[in-house]
């Protein structure tokens, strides 16, 4: 039987406990999980690619079958390069499903071998998004129950730098 691998793409700006939950669960379902951290030029990320990779590694590095890779360009091309089995996407709400369904179908048009696997987050993470976390942190709110400790510390450093 061949090894199964799944790509979990995102900007992870920052990684949240919801992301950690999905990767942890995927690591039990697939032989290999590739956390593919998009450069995200169009999103103007708060954290650099290097910072986001380091935060993901510190949050998930204890999982031996998880690797962390920065990438740029079309996901479907990265999928082919990695020879992945599938792409993992999290679904928090019906609105996520509509967008992800459209995206998966477009990617399948570009590559008929493209497969998407959808997981819903554990209930306590269903409302968390990186966008909300950044906004709470920007306004100096407490995000400790939503993100790994390394992210809390990274936000503290951003505040010390005048963010």
From Swiss-Prot:
<keyword id="KW-0173">Coenzyme A biosynthesis</keyword>
<dbReference type="GO" id="GO:0005524">
    <property type="term" value="F:ATP binding"/>
</dbReference>
<feature type="binding site">
    <location>
        <begin position="90"/>
        <end position="92"/>
    </location>
    <ligand>
        <name>ATP</name>
    </ligand>
</feature>
<feature type="binding site">
    <location>
        <begin position="125"/>
        <end position="131"/>
    </location>
    <ligand>
        <name>ATP</name>
    </ligand>
</feature>
<comment type="pathway">
    <text>Cofactor biosynthesis; coenzyme A biosynthesis; CoA from (R)-pantothenate: step 4/5.</text>
</comment>
<keyword id="KW-0808">Transferase</keyword>
<dbReference type="Pfam" id="PF01467">
    <property type="entry name" value="CTP_transf_like"/>
</dbReference>
<dbReference type="InterPro" id="IPR001980">
    <property type="entry name" value="PPAT"/>
</dbReference>
<comment type="function">
    <text>Reversibly transfers an adenylyl group from ATP to 4'-phosphopantetheine, yielding dephospho-CoA (dPCoA) and pyrophosphate.</text>
</comment>
<dbReference type="GO" id="GO:0015937">
    <property type="term" value="P:coenzyme A biosynthetic process"/>
</dbReference>
<dbReference type="InterPro" id="IPR004821">
    <property type="entry name" value="Cyt_trans-like"/>
</dbReference>
<comment type="subunit">
    <text>Homohexamer.</text>
</comment>
<feature type="binding site">
    <location>
        <position position="100"/>
    </location>
    <ligand>
        <name>ATP</name>
    </ligand>
</feature>
<keyword id="KW-0067">ATP-binding</keyword>
<keyword id="KW-0963">Cytoplasm</keyword>
<comment type="similarity">
    <text>Belongs to the bacterial CoaD family.</text>
</comment>
<feature type="binding site">
    <location>
        <position position="89"/>
    </location>
    <ligand>
        <name>substrate</name>
    </ligand>
</feature>
<dbReference type="InterPro" id="IPR014729">
    <property type="entry name" value="Rossmann-like_a/b/a_fold"/>
</dbReference>
<feature type="binding site">
    <location>
        <position position="19"/>
    </location>
    <ligand>
        <name>ATP</name>
    </ligand>
</feature>
<feature type="binding site">
    <location>
        <position position="75"/>
    </location>
    <ligand>
        <name>substrate</name>
    </ligand>
</feature>
<dbReference type="GO" id="GO:0005737">
    <property type="term" value="C:cytoplasm"/>
</dbReference>
<keyword id="KW-0548">Nucleotidyltransferase</keyword>
<feature type="binding site">
    <location>
        <position position="43"/>
    </location>
    <ligand>
        <name>substrate</name>
    </ligand>
</feature>
<feature type="binding site">
    <location>
        <position position="11"/>
    </location>
    <ligand>
        <name>substrate</name>
    </ligand>
</feature>
<protein>
    <recommendedName>
        <fullName>Phosphopantetheine adenylyltransferase</fullName>
        <ecNumber>2.7.7.3</ecNumber>
    </recommendedName>
</protein>
<feature type="site" description="Transition state stabilizer">
    <location>
        <position position="19"/>
    </location>
</feature>
<dbReference type="GO" id="GO:0004595">
    <property type="term" value="F:pantetheine-phosphate adenylyltransferase activity"/>
</dbReference>
<keyword id="KW-0547">Nucleotide-binding</keyword>
<feature type="binding site">
    <location>
        <begin position="11"/>
        <end position="12"/>
    </location>
    <ligand>
        <name>ATP</name>
    </ligand>
</feature>
<keyword id="KW-0460">Magnesium</keyword>
